[in-house]
């Protein structure tokens, strides 16, 4: 599917802001779409963006190049897409913390420097450095890798909460003048864990990753469950069916757990989650955003492309590890 991938990169290039970032949403012709993100936070005028959306495109291009070795695409998109994006990310760094400045989070709700967005920015700058090296731009490669190293180093001390044995959702400076006085959000958020391990911000064998997964199990898993259906974060109120529940399960977050199992060689545990998702999938193959935790009825958007994509992503990784799974996944899906 290389032509589709290149068409996506071309679309991103069309809508790229002159400062090197992507806006929250776009219309089909590449014009900025509607957004509910405010331009003013406190007394500051800010770009109403989610930095992870910019970062993930650079990371994806790195994955594309690693898989295809497409020099022609790299030479075309490096000056017009990769370099502007990487330059923006490398410049959009808090000089005190060495972490990215706050932007809106991936759930489109909070203005924070989140663990998730930090992880994606880190991985994107690593990828950008390798792409720069591939086109002979040594100065770019060294600079972006150095910024990535600073981010990873700072994350070890600023983004893990030992009191909760979990990653902070994020933090924000208390005011524009409070350079070192920061306010943490310690909500247990699945995206914080996913970002930390999937994008290499923390080592897979680190105590932070291991203890954080134990915390997820303690907070979200009932004693009689084989699969831990995951909400976005604790006490998520979006479309919550029961005020006493911790939140509705989301397919994407539950599948992130399966991806963690695959990364830690627990294929059978991952397979149980894939089976759990398939058992709730419509006969048409459609997945929703969320489900009712008691009746398993679909809630909110269906189909949700993100849910579909995470299922395919997880199933492909599972098939790669266990080829015999292919026949059952393709037959049942």
PLM region descriptions:
Residues 31-32, 242-253, 271-333:
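CBM-like carbohydrate-recognition segments
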Residues 14-39, 114-119, 141-252:
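Extended ligand-binding clefts on enzyme/binding-domain cores
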Residues 27-29, 101-109, 170-174, 234-236, ...:
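Short linear capping/connector segments at secondary-structure termini
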Residues 1-3, 46, 56-73, 120-137, ...:
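Well-ordered alpha-helical scaffold segments within catalytic/enzyme domains
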Residues 1-15, 71-89, 134-158, 205-219, ...:
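Extended, well-ordered alpha-helical scaffold segments
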Residues 3, 48-56, 77-80, 112-124, ...:
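Aromatic- and histidine-enriched alpha-helix N-cap/loop-to-helix transition segments
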Residues 85, 89-156:
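Internal metal/ion-chelating core segments
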Residues 2-68, 72-95, 273-305:
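Helix-terminus loop motifs that line ligand-binding clefts
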């Amino acid at each position: 599917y290389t032509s589709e991938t290149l068409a996506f990169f071309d679309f991103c290039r069309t809508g790229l802001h002159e400062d090197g970032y992507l806006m929250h949403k776009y219309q089909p012709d590449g014009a900025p779409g509607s957004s509910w993100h405010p331009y003013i936070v406190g007394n500051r005028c800010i770009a109403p963006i989610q930095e992870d959306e910019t970062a993930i495109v650079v990371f994806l291009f790195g994955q594309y190049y690693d898989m295809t070795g497409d020099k022609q695409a790299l030479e075309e998109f490096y000056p017009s897409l990769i370099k502007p994006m990487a330059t923006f990310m490398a410049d959009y760094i808090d000089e005190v913390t060495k972490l990215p400045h706050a932007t809106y989070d991936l759930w489109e709700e909070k203005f924070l420097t989140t663990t998730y967005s930090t992880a994606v920015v880190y991985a994107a700058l690593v990828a950008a450095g390798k792409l720069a090296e591939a086109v002979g731009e040594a100065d770019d490669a060294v600079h972006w890798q150095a910024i990535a190293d600073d981010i990873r180093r700072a994350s070890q001390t600023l983004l893990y909460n030992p009191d909760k044995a979990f990653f902070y959702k994020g933090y924000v400076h208390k005011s524009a003048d409070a350079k070192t006085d920061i306010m943490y959000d310690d909500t247990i958020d699945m995206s914080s864990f996913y970002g930390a391990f999937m994008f290499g911000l923390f080592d897979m064998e680190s105590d932070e990753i291991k203890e954080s997964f134990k915390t997820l199990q303690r907070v979200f898993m009932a004693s009689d469950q084989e699969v831990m259906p995951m909400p976005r974060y604790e006490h998520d109120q979006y479309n919550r069916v029961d005020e006493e529940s911790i939140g509705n399960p989301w397919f994407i977050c539950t599948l992130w757990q399966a991806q963690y199992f695959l990364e830690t060689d627990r294929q059978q545990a991952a397979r149980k989650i894939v089976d759990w998702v398939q058992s709730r999938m419509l006969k048409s193959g459609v997945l929703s955003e969320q489900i009712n935790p008691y009746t398993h009825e679909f809630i909110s958007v269906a189909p949700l492309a993100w849910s579909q994509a995470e299922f395919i992503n997880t199933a492909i990784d599972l098939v790669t590890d266990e080829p015999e799974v292919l026949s059952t996944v393709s037959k049942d899906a």
